[in-house]
Design a protein with these regions (language model features):
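Extreme N-terminal starter segment of soluble prokaryotic enzymes
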Residues: 1-4
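Alpha/beta-hydrolase
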Residues: 6-8, 118
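Local cysteine-cluster metal-coordination motifs and their immediate loop/turn environment
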Residues: 9-20
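Conserved non-cysteine loop/helix-boundary elements of the Radical SAM core domain that shape
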Residues: 22-46, 50-165
Length: 165
């Protein structure tokens, strides 16, 4: 079984708990996305006989990319790899990026799972973590994702948050 992980290393704001590679400077995003497509092309022979079962967009904040750009990555992967057995395509998302319009557009892609970075349902903890959303906004994002047709929605909780203060 093979999977493809695409790391989108950009964030509007850097969270206090995050150890992943990321940048709050969004200016090079277009160039990085183009470089990722180039690397996919270069490394396509790495999995010649494997069927991709999963595509996972992690970060950083993949939900900073328009849904159409995420779909371009999926289409590109399907050109380069055998995706006939694709079982799951996941996008990590911040609650504040998941507007009804964004979710509608994302639902028209092959993305079928959302991993929403809720981190906490406590506003005080969210402030400690330097998160942009509130607990109510997180609840709303999860509900709106389900209403947009996403039947596979997970939301992450970061319990080391109380140790940050």
């Amino acid at each position: 079984m093979a999977g493809l992980y695409l790391h989108i290393p950009f964030c509007k704001r850097v969270c206090a708990y995050c150890d992943f590679y990321k940048s709050a400077d969004l200016r090079p995003m277009k160039a990085v996305v183009e470089a990722m497509h180039d690397e996919l092309r270069r490394e396509a022979g790495f999995l010649p006989a494997e069927q991709l079962r999963t595509i996972y967009f992690g970060g950083g904040t993949p939900s900073l990319l328009p849904p159409e750009e995420l779909e371009e990555f999926i289409a590109h992967a399907a050109e380069l790899f055998d995706c006939t057995a694709l079982e799951e395509c996941t996008v990590e998302a911040n609650p504040d990026d998941l507007t009804p319009d964004y979710l509608r557009r994302l639902a028209r892609t092959r993305v079928d799972r959302l991993s929403i970075g809720v981190q906490s349902f406590d506003d005080g903890e969210l402030r400690l973590m330097n998160r942009r959303h509130t607990a109510d906004a997180a609840r709303k994002a999860v509900r709106q994702a389900q209403e947009a047709g996403f039947g596979n929605v997970t939301w992450g909780i970061c319990k080391k948050a109380t140790q940050l203060g």
